[in-house]
């Protein structure tokens, strides 16, 4: 019985379709703001670490069918 239930659950999970490709509107421009910190060094106490902070703004606009312009 457990085997049948497991097989049914796996079949249901495997048949689910997800859309991986993002969909952007052709009439709108999507704007994303990213912020990241990159640290170098050892995580032990008493040792120095160096790092850099990155800020990024990305604009995505439709260029043609299934083609996009990133700025």
Curated annotation (Swiss-Prot):
Residues 1-15 form the signal peptide. InterPro entries: Lipid_transp_b-sht_shell, Vitellinogen_b-sht_N, Vitellogenin/Apolipophorin, Vitellogenin_N. One of its GO terms (molecular function) is nutrient reservoir activity. Keywords: Phosphoprotein, Signal, Storage protein. Produced by the liver, secreted into the blood and then sequestered by receptor mediated endocytosis into growing oocytes, where it is generally cleaved, giving rise to the respective yolk components. Residues 24-71 form the Vitellogenin domain. Gene3D superfamilies: Lipovitellin, beta-sheet shell regions, chain A. Pfam families: Vitellogenin_N. Induction: By steroids (estrogen). Precursor of the major egg-yolk proteins that are sources of nutrients during early development of oviparous organisms. This is Vitellogenin-A1.
């Amino acid at each position: 019985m457990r085997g049948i239930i497991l097989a049914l659950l796996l079949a249901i999970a495997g048949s689910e379709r997800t859309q991986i490709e993002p969909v952007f509107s052709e009439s709108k421009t999507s704007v994303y703001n990213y912020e990241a910190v990159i640290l170098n060094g050892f995580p032990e106490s008493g040792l120095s670490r160096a790092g850099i902070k990155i800020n990024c703004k990305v604009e995505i606009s439709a260029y043609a069918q299934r083609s996009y312009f990133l700025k």
